[in-house]
A protein has these predicted regions:
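Active-site mouth loops of central-metabolism enzymes
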Residues: 28-40, 106-120, 201-214, 274-282
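Short glycine-enriched loops at secondary-structure junctions
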Residues: 36-39, 85-93, 97, 135-145, ...
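Catalytic domains of carbohydrate-active enzymes, especially glycoside hydrolases
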Residues: 46-58, 124-126, 131-136
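A short aromatic-anchored loop/beta-hairpin motif
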Residues: 33-37, 51-65, 75
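Second-shell residues forming the walls of enzyme active-site clefts
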Residues: 60-77, 81-83, 91-95, 160-325
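Preference for extracellular/luminal or secreted protein segments
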Residues: 1-50, 280-494
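A charged helix-plus-loop insertion that forms the helical arch/lid used to bind
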Residues: 99-113, 157-159
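Alpha-helical scaffold segments that flank or form the walls of functional sites
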Residues: 113-134, 216, 287-293
């Protein structure tokens, strides 16, 4: 099959599988597909005309805001799609994928702990999304980050207190939805206590149901009460709830807990099914069927599935109905929820002009300085390279844009020569920039070597400030967004 062939071609053909074109349309309507490039391929446009649920955009779909607006307009011409992306502020951004976000992320907002500020920041982000034609934001993150070494949440979380996370999640939901952008609160029932990345494997949340209710579920309960339009499922296993299944595939999680116990009747969206927790356990197509049967309404496929994969998933869903493993009524229920969401889109839209200003204000309020930096003398900056997570991608970070007068080198900690770096920094101000040093032993070792010779050096931590070495000055930004970096440099140069 050609890579550009319509993945739904044949869906209206009575000879195709069940012979029910309406059923094929229902199956297609449950999919949020993705594609490469900055313009929509023909197969996507034809698919939207034939009932595909919508699209999820990634960094590779973005050149600038004007281009995204044009892309979204073309998608909306083809149908009534959900047009979504991950815009969390901080490290995870799609609109600012090539520059870094003008807004700090949740950890910075949680550190400030001003819910009015959080609402204003999310409202400003929502205005950006409105201008770009997006109608659903895959955010906010409502995970309570209780595992210091969590490889995938970290600064994406408001913090480790359920109550703090809950009140800021509510503020974020209000900020987004007051501008007409549907919030998608994630990752249910909670990804904050994990030590693994669900992009790579099935993480484990080893918590009793009572602990879940006291900790992980507190922000989700608050978000539901605040009217969150959608909630994203997590590919995490909670033995007390899901057994060995990821929550995305668990009826106990999505139907019994979320729908019945918590009383949620909004749209349930899966995390990307191409993540290894699903694709390398039950597979994409079977994962789609199991997620729908569990209670999901929209299936985010992620960036990897091809047009052929999409066609195969539609066929597999239709086959599952024919085999009695999934009911047409379940698909109709999902479609009705998504249709209600579409009817809500744009009902309330408000323009704001704060943008970068509110983002920088929030970053300035979050950044903290311990010790004294002193005047900078011919600064030499060592940025310690940190491998990006899949959720973040190759978003630029660091202080370089804001310190044009400095000599800046970026090094891999396992390859760096501390002696050579110290030689270059002789008689100069030494600034060491790192992200999440607490999770990277090689980074900590290099910093310790540098500080042993230069205890007057400044350390700028652009992740979570958990490991605090004895430095002349220690700056914590609570995130690596462009706004966080600027706020840190302002402290250094004040």
């Amino acid at each position: 099959m050609s890579a550009t062939r319509d993945p739904l071609a044949g869906a209206a053909d009575p000879s195709t599988r069940t012979g029910d074109p309406g059923l094929h349309r229902l199956a297609a309507g449950a999919l949020l597909i993705s594609f490469r490039g900055t313009t929509a391929p023909d197969w996507v446009l034809r698919g939207l005309e034939d009932g595909l649920g919508g699209v999820c955009l990634f960094g590779f779909n973005v050149a600038d805001g004007e281009q995204v607006a044009a892309l979204s307009a073309r998608l909306h011409e083809a149908g009534r799609p959900v047009v979504s992306l991950d815009e969390e502020g901080g490290d995870v951004t799609r609109l600012a994928y090539h520059t870094g976000s003008a807004y700090p992320g949740n950890a910075a907002l949680g550190a400030v702990d001003d819910v009015a500020l959080t609402e204003r920041v999310y409202h400003a982000m929502a205005a950006d999304l409105v201008r770009c034609g997006v109608n659903l934001d895959m955010g906010p993150v409502a995970d309570v980050n209780t595992a210091d070494d969590n490889p995938i949440i970290g600064t994406r979380s408001f913090g480790s207190s359920p109550e703090l996370v809950a009140r800021h999640t509510v503020a974020a939901v209000r900020g987004l939805q007051s501008a007409g952008i549907a919030a998608c609160v994630k990752h249910f029932p909670g990804h904050g206590a994990t030590h693994q990345d669900s992009h790579l494997e099935i993480p484990l949340v080893d918590a009793s149901l009572d602990l879940l209710r006291e900790r992980e579920l507190v922000p989700f309960r608050a978000a539901i009460e605040a009217g969150a339009k959608s909630i994203m499922s997590a590919h995490v296993a909670v033995p007390s709830l899901t057994g060995t299944l990821p929550a995305t595939l668990s009826r106990e999680t999505l139907t019994r807990l979320l729908r019945r116990e918590l009383g949620y009747d909004g749209v349930v969206i899966t995390d990307a099914l191409d993540m290894h927790a699903i694709s390398r356990s039950v597979g994409l197509a079977e994962g789609a069927v199991m997620a729908l049967a569990a209670g999901a309404d929209l299936l985010c496929l992620g960036p990897l599935p091809t047009p052929e994969d999409v066609r195969g998933m539609v066929d597999h869903i239709v086959d599952a109905v024919a085999e009695g493993r999934l009911t047409a009524e379940r698909l109709e229920e999902a479609a009705a929820r998504v249709e209600r969401l579409r009817d809500w889109f744009g009902a309330t839209r408000a323009e704001v002009a704060e943008g970068d200003v509110i983002g920088l204000d929030a970053a300035r309020r979050a950044v903290s300085l311990t010790g004294s930096a002193g005047p900078l003398v011919d600064p030499f900056v060592v940025e310690i390279d940190t491998p990006p997570t899949i959720a973040v991608g190759e978003v630029p970070w660091g202080v370089a844009p804001w310190l044009p007068q400095a000599e800046i080198v970026r090094v891999k900690p396992e390859e760096a020569d501390a002696g050579a770096l110290l030689g270059r920094a002789r008689d100069r101000s030494l600034i060491v920039v790192v992200k999440d040093a607490h999770r990277h032993p090689d980074s900590r070792e290099l910093i310790s070597e540098l500080l042993a010779a230069r205890p007057d050096a400044v350390v700028v931590e652009m992740g979570l400030p958990i490991w605090r070495p004895g430095a002349g000055a220690y700056i914590a930004t609570y995130g690596a967004a462009r706004a966080n970096a600027r706020a840190a440099v302002e402290l250094l140069t004040a």
